[in-house]
Amino acid sequence: MTSPEQLACHLARARARTLRLVDFDDAELCCQYDPLMSPLVWDLAHIGQQEELWLLRGGDPGQPGLLPPAVEGLYDAFEHSRASRVELPLLSPARARSYCATVRSAALDALAALPEDGDSFVFAMVISHENQHDETMLQALNLRTGSPLLAATSALPAGRPRMAGTSVLVAGGPFVLGVDAADEPCSLDNERQAHVVDVPAFRIGRVPVTNGEWQDFIDDGGYTQSRWWSERGWQHRQRAGLTAPQFWRSGGRTRTRFGHVEDIPADEPVQHVSYFEAEAYAAWAGARLPTEVEWEKACAWDPATGSRRRYPWGTEEPTDTYANLGGQTLRPAPVGAYPAGASACGAEQMLGDVWEWTTSPLRPWPGFVPMVYERYSQPFFGGDYRVLRGGSWAVEPAILRPSFRNWDHPYRRQIFAGVRLAWDI
């Protein structure tokens, strides 16, 4: 189990990042950049409310909290849609910051009092929750118009030439899908339980699809020919007027990114495409999207040892030697930038850079047991969602694993999502 010292470090790192993302004036925090997203001040107070609920009140909403019930209810994500939150009588930014600080002080006291053999999972869950909201706030900030508020604080390594369009073989046979709490104590409920599945051999892209490759799709009329699209995808394309990835400007040579207008790097993984677009691109390219089971095998399975790797590259914790994570770069890295991060089959950039769409709907693994936060996964099973894998440049390294499962509606584009192709053999 993760030590109290490590948990305290991860809590501090997440909070420092959160506060950087709300280090703006009140008007900025209280406005809504897009109906798809909450005002930043809602996310800030929601982070504190969930931390208080799980770490100070044992997950019992009936137990008195620091906020009046009517105020606390404003931060129930199931009761209030993102579009409606700007109209709610939310805490002011100053009160939200003060509330979060008060909760954090008490949470650290609770962590210090945790017995040596105590169950620290709920702390890991709260750390994951805050970091996931930090990525959500980055999505909101990317939708903002006007002069830039954010600037990258980390440089990216150079890519390698002739990586786009290449693929690697993933051998057929059984592998262990998912994880158990004993091996990954911080894993969330939908990642469990570990179980053996058989996967036929296939090929998978060595790297994600690039902007340059996507431009070829556009130039070849990919957005104007229904033959590449599913029936539902084509209907959505027509209704939404899609002609290029979100944030690409007319003409396809420049884009907006966090308020900056810039040239589109040809060797960077494409992002801000929906599942429908990813599906159409794959058909045009003579390929398909991987299932999430295929994706996890390509990422984590080592046929030489007949066992899972904790990370694609092995057991070492994620660093900028292996992957582009942590949100400091504000963009994906060029393909081929992380050869040391390759998986056993040779696939690169499986973690970080862009979330990767799979064909899989969100379903529980056999033996699924909901965690203490029962509404994390269960309400979304069987819904209109597609699973995304691998994380993005905006994900905190401490919460990401090959088994981590994200999901969203197939029409979503504001997320930092891209594409990796697969082929039958």
From Swiss-Prot:
Pathway(s) this gene product operates in, as recorded in its UniProt entry: Amino-acid biosynthesis; ergothioneine biosynthesis
EC number of the protein: 1.14.99.50
Disulfides per UniProt: none
Catalytic activity line of the entry: gamma-L-glutamyl-L-cysteine + hercynine + O2 = gamma-L-glutamyl-hercynylcysteine S-oxide + H2O
Binding site for gamma-L-glutamyl-L-cysteine: 82-85, 408, 412
Induction data: Expressed in log phase, part of the egtA-egtB-egtC-egtD operon, which does not include egtE.
SUPFAM superfamilies registered for this protein in UniProt: C-type lectin-like, DinB/YfiT-like putative metalloenzymes
Cofactor(s) in the UniProt record: Fe(2+)
Binding residues for Fe cation: 46, 129, 133
Single GO MF annotation: gamma-glutamyl hercynylcysteine sulfoxide synthase activity
Statement: the UniProt record of this protein carries the keyword Signal: no
Pfam families registered for this protein in UniProt: DinB_2, FGE-sulfatase
Keywords: Iron, Metal-binding, Monooxygenase, Oxidoreductase
Enzyme class: oxidoreductase
Keyword Metal-binding: yes
Function: Catalyzes the oxidative sulfurization of hercynine (N-alpha,N-alpha,N-alpha-trimethyl-L-histidine) into hercynyl-gamma-L-glutamyl-L-cysteine sulfoxide, a step in the biosynthesis pathway of ergothioneine (ERG). ERG is one of the major redox buffers which protects bacteria against redox stressors and antibiotics; loss of ERG or mycothiol (MSH, the other major redox buffer in this bacteria) leads to respiratory alterations and bioenergetic deficiencies that negatively impact virulence.
Family to which the UniProt record says this protein belongs: Belongs to the EgtB family.
Protein name in UniProt: Hercynine oxygenase
Gene for this chain: egtB
